[in-house]
Amino acid sequence: MDYNLYDFLPLYHPVQTPAFDRDVNSLSEFTQYELPREEEFPQNPGDLMLHQKLISNFINPHTLYDGVLLVHEMGTGKTCTSVAVAEEFIKNNYSSGETYPYTMVKKIIVLTKGKGLQNNFVNEIANVCTWGQYLEGLDRYIRNRDKKIKKNVKVHYTFDTFEIFAKNLAKMSTNEKRMTYENSLFIVDEAHNLRLHSDPEEGNIYSEIYDLFHLLKSRKILLLTGTPMKDRPEEIIDLFNLILRTPLSVEDLDQPEQFKRKINGHVSYLRAMISDVDRREMGKKLGSLNHFRVQPVVMGDFQSQIYQLAKAKDDEEKSIFNNSRQSSAMVFPDGTYGKQGFEANILPTTSGHKLKPEIRDELRLNLRKYSAKYADLIDRLKVDYTEGRLSFVFSEFVKGSGLVALGLLLELNGYVKATPSSNFAKPQKRYAIFTNETSTDAQTKQLISAFNNPKNLKGEYISTILGSRVIMEGFSFKNIQSEYILSPHWNYSETSQIIARGLRLGSHNDLKKNNIKFEVRIYHYVSLANKNYPAESIDLHMYEIAEEKDLEIQKILRYIKEAAFDCRLNQQRNTITNRKFDGTRNCEYSSCSYECSNQVDIGHDNRNYRLLYFQSADQYEKLKATIIETASRQPFTIEQIVAETKHSEFEVMTVIESLLNYRKVLFTRPEGYYYLSNIKNLFFASNVVFDRDKHYDSNDPTLLNYYTKYTTVYMGKSIGQLIQENQQKYMVFLVKKIFKSKNLVELQKYMVQLPIYLQEKLLSYSISVRHQDIKNNFVRDMVLNNFKLYYKIQDPQAFIWLNPENFLCTANYRDPDQWKPCTPSQQRDIEYMKRDRANIKVSNNSYGFIGLLNRKTNDFCLKKLQGPTLSDEPTDKRKRNVGKRCQNWKKVDLVDLVANKLKVVPDEDFDFTAEDANTVKNNPKFKKLVTPEMDQNDLKRLAFWNAQDVNHLCRTTLTQFTAQKLVVDDPNCGTANKIR
């Protein structure tokens, strides 16, 4: 095994160098995460996707890369990507075995636009992006859970809004900033909101944060965004300049190659996994549009006149065209529109809204007069329903002339509004509406679940979805075949996000499985005041401006995609293979195929991976398992493992050295623990600790034959002697642990591992010194408490029946040397004692249960007592109630026992208000447990114990029953040997 010094030194090259390009496309810690075209989403909390692992290896304690802009589309898991990076630093800060150079961060600071986003971020950290470490200890609480989670998360993460963070920075001196924020990791969520602004206050926020990032010499920065530019290409300059040590200028945008060189190593680009189903933009190109297709509808004279007045009002008020936009959607028969029209023509009801009766028939019969857009839409929705196509309609307007009014128009045309209580077993023409004002999150999720159900393929449950901006994040629709965009936006990025709700990866799998041929048709509605003057349209005007902006933005986005450090690694995922999209927005208005700036071929260089990452990789654990399994069977050499596993010699030695140096237990057998040992290049399992520095004559053929033949090496002693010696060593170890126990649970953990004769020894000595003031009286009392079911003292006599095959008795329990096997008559007396004790437990028991404990298995059972006061005697006398494991009882019975009968007090920090008490009273699941005479304390107990898991309820019951001497010995508890 010949190694050079550089084999043990990790190496990363600086960005913007040819060596960096080689590193990114060849180092195994990066290239092993090359993305396939499709990838399954994680099923368990803390599981990461490939691109998330890649970024966490790029911005990492061991790398010198200090700032990356993540241009990752919506749905790629940007939050979890940043958390994966942060958790690597947290893990490294607490690692005691780190041997290579690394960056330790003092703080992890998450910056968001508003406080609401912070709550989402905390929730993602605790429940989605990590394996549960921030939820530990919370399973027993139902109140203040979010507050407790946030407290746990804030141990490692600090949260601030852009505004508050900038204001605090403005109050700090330069030295204070350095002292506070040097060696910090900054995560900036929705970073496109942080930019130079015409508003002085917004501009100051950007400047303060920019100055801090450039003041710090050692910092790591992650900027998260799915839309780095919304209105102008120049917005990207502000973003990159937050992380670049050498700033960009606007002129760089006109020099693509120079721009790409300057951002090299500082940007990652990733498309979402989107559906590759056929989609068709309906309509035609109008006005100055060269790429966007729109679906034009011409207003009738009445609507057109009102629209012209609304437009003039907007021009006069120099407003944001709200009047024009509302009136182009719909005007009411009285000539009103928007907020005024809504209040004058739509009435509130207990379940929502309704149209005034006097306008219902007019709108049903002459809708095109008042809304060309809605009349055309409803005609198309009727065809969709008839032909079994699911449809999705979007408008950013809810009230006014928006979605609520549209829903009422649908009802005039035979639709029924779907609610969570709808009878979906009966097919019906239904629509569902999702807005902040018409449905809660829970209701929205229920209805989307019904809509996405494979049984709703042709609209049997719900045929049409009406959605506002509330559905932009977190919701996806399946099997949509028609999408209708009723209101445009000044930039197209938001419109594209809306369309993507119905075009996700796998969103149309149910249609494919049923061999239904389909395409997704997309309609961008524009209302024209007059077909001869298409420019007279606020809708068309907005699309023209959006396209003009989008052409420039997408050109810069193509540069970013080509310059991304992970361009080659993500190319399969990012490339759209359907040639029909060439020249469209989907491919940045260019060819869908593209070349990366970094042209280095993908390779696999393990120089850093084996040093920094191998020990935390799945391959390491698999190799370790193989080595342990081999050692359990026979001795082995390194060469044998290399040949068998195809791992490198370095990797095999890494595992072996870890097992040797840290004396890790390979496996346990009755004679003790086994460790890995070696003599030169021969490795074997042994429960004898070998001194690695001691010389052994490994050339002795007899010794070598012995090593090869036997897994474990012993010298000069019989197997029986060695087993006895090792058992003695282990027993000493257990007894030491018992005498260091801090509580009864800890003592029981080690006590059950002792042979029964040693348990008897400890119990008999504890009985003999029960009245003495000894050093370990705390342990003595725990031993007596642990075995209280298995002894009785009748001063001066005492009896122990811990071992069912050998009872112990003494005529003078104060003398520890007088314990002897019981005589037959004493054994009979003990059986009477046990029976009498059980009878007392039944007769004095007001709880309806008795506890059974199996000492051999530590199983705890509950037996329901029978009798006239507790339950009727069974008519079939052959059936006997023998009890069952506590965990097998219904939770409601255990809650009733602990809360209502034992009346165990809840934890001190369990908050409970009068409002909570009313909730408990009215909750159907507490119906059998709540009685009229219960006060707030009773209800608090009930709520608390209902929030606990069954294991905790059983532990509490055992503790309470043991304290009240309501537990009896039963060797059949928890076994299949019950007498029935």
UniProtKB/Swiss-Prot annotation:
<keyword id="KW-0378">Hydrolase</keyword>
<dbReference type="GO" id="GO:0005524">
    <property type="term" value="F:ATP binding"/>
</dbReference>
<feature type="domain" description="Helicase ATP-binding">
    <location>
        <begin position="59"/>
        <end position="246"/>
    </location>
</feature>
<keyword id="KW-0547">Nucleotide-binding</keyword>
<feature type="domain" description="Helicase C-terminal">
    <location>
        <begin position="389"/>
        <end position="546"/>
    </location>
</feature>
<feature type="short sequence motif" description="DEAH box">
    <location>
        <begin position="189"/>
        <end position="192"/>
    </location>
</feature>
<keyword id="KW-0347">Helicase</keyword>
<keyword id="KW-0677">Repeat</keyword>
<dbReference type="InterPro" id="IPR027417">
    <property type="entry name" value="P-loop_NTPase"/>
</dbReference>
<dbReference type="InterPro" id="IPR002464">
    <property type="entry name" value="DNA/RNA_helicase_DEAH_CS"/>
</dbReference>
<dbReference type="GO" id="GO:0004386">
    <property type="term" value="F:helicase activity"/>
</dbReference>
<comment type="similarity">
    <text>Belongs to the IIV-6 022L family. SNF2/RAD54 helicase subfamily.</text>
</comment>
<dbReference type="InterPro" id="IPR014001">
    <property type="entry name" value="Helicase_ATP-bd"/>
</dbReference>
<protein>
    <recommendedName>
        <fullName>Putative helicase 087L</fullName>
        <ecNumber>3.6.4.-</ecNumber>
    </recommendedName>
</protein>
<dbReference type="GO" id="GO:0016787">
    <property type="term" value="F:hydrolase activity"/>
</dbReference>
<dbReference type="InterPro" id="IPR050496">
    <property type="entry name" value="SNF2_RAD54_helicase_repair"/>
</dbReference>
<dbReference type="Pfam" id="PF00176">
    <property type="entry name" value="SNF2-rel_dom"/>
</dbReference>
<feature type="binding site">
    <location>
        <begin position="72"/>
        <end position="79"/>
    </location>
    <ligand>
        <name>ATP</name>
    </ligand>
</feature>
<dbReference type="InterPro" id="IPR000330">
    <property type="entry name" value="SNF2_N"/>
</dbReference>
<keyword id="KW-0067">ATP-binding</keyword>
